[in-house]
Structures are given as structure tokens and as C-alpha cells.
Amino acid sequence: TTVLAADDLSGVAAILDGVRRIQASGVPYPRIEIVFTVGEEPQLRGSRHYDFTQLQSKLGFALDSPGRIGRVVNAAPSTAQLYYDVYGKSAHAGNAPEKGINALVVSSKILASINEGRLDPESTANFAICSAGNATNVVCDHVHVEGETRSSCHEKMEAYCEYFEKFCHDTVEGTGAKIETRVDKVYRCFRVDENSATINLMRKVFSEMGIEMTVERGGGGMDANRLNEHGVECVGLATGYAQNHTPNEYVYVDDLIKSGEMVQKIILNYEA
């Protein structure tokens, strides 16, 4: 989003620095696997095509979370992309508007009434992309809308997807317009127990560094979603950045430097 790109080049920098520290120290270290994915934004597209059978590791750490160093994200939501297309009927807007069916008006009925925003404490829905028409003197005959839903409960996410499709079709019924809906279930939620091997390892790491650790649920997806789905117990680790996805993104330099040390200690404290 910004030239800084702390989300998530701060994580890349921390990994490279941690490995550099290990190599420079000359101390023996266990076998490690490092995966740099492309296209993490949006919808974890890169890791969607990764061959996870290449990995031997059973524990993992995704350096891709906002917040001060010491923050561990042990849960992230399931997410689905939502799409619909409303097809109306074009007509001259000045000579014969009554002969047309305005797809934009029909679409507005959906967006004005559908349940969206904060659905419950662990679920959200958002509609953010809309394209329609190309001239003001033509009754709009096509609208394309894109949105998403996410929830820390996979079943709630699936339930909203069903609600979305039914609501759209029910709303369009009787208007003369037609609608097509599509749902793409992008990635599955995960929750790692606070007494798991990954979090216990991080307790040891942060204790050695004199940093207070917090364990929290995250609101966004990350490659840890895919790793957990494929049998690698993985948590997210903060690297000191904030206000990501905005032009005001920044990173605490001290946290960034400490993140390299954190990676070094993760490697040295890992027990196969």
C-alpha cells in the first residue's frame, strides 16, 4: 500500500536478519525451512498454489502481523469472496426509460438491506467494489458487485455465504431483472491452543529477550491459515508495524531490529 511496505517486508527483513545472525554466530542450528510466498495480498493467492508436500516442518511462524513485538496471533478467520451481477434492460433514458430495467436501482435494494458490517463479535461482511453503466443517457443494464465475509467460526462464514445468495435472489425476484451470484471460499480459519508447542516456544523466546508476550485473535488472514490447513501448526508474529493498508503505515525501528533477534532465538530454541 505504501513505499514503506512494512506489511510485509518487515517480516522478510526480520527473517533474513535472523538467518544472517545465525550464520555469523557459527553456532550449530537445526534444519529450518523458509517459505517466501508471492501474492499474499489479496486473499493469500500465492500460498493457494503452493505445494505443501514439500515441507517437512510441523511448526511454523508467519511474520505477518501488525503490533509491537511480543504480539502472537493464534487465530485468524475464514474468508470468502462474494460476487453478484444484476442484469437489467437498457433503454434510452430520455425517450423511453419505462422500457428499461435499471440494474443499478435493483442492486441498490440489495446493498441497502443486506446484513453487513459487524455481524457478531467474530464475524463481518463488507461490500466494497461496484461497477455499473457507461453513460447517463442509458438505463443501466448491468451491475457487478464484489464483497467479502469473514469469521473466526468457519460454520458462520458458510452460513453467511448461503444467506448472501438467497437474499440476493429473493430481493431481485419480481423486479424483472436477473441475477447471478458466486462465492469463492478463499481460506479456512485456524485457532492454535495457548499451550501449544509454537506458543510455548515463543514464551521461551520472549522471556530470554525480556519482552512481554500477548496472545490475541487476528481479524485478517495470513499464510498461517494455509499452513494450519495443511497440517503445519503456525502462529502469526508481530514485527512492529502499524496502520498497514493505509498511507500512514509505519514501523518501530527498534521492533524491526528485535524481530531479527527473535527469529534467531526461534531457530536456536527449536527442538526437533
Please identify what each model-predicted range represents:
Residues 1-41, 80-86, 95-116, 147, ...:
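Alpha-helical metal-binding/catalytic segments enriched in His/Glu/Asp
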Residues 37, 64, 85-89, 150-152, ...:
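Solvent-exposed residues in well-ordered beta-strands and their adjoining turns
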Residues 72-85, 204, 235:
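Acidic-glycine-rich active-site phosphate/pyrophosphate-binding loop
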Residues 103-272:
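Metal-dependent amide/peptide-bond hydrolase catalytic core
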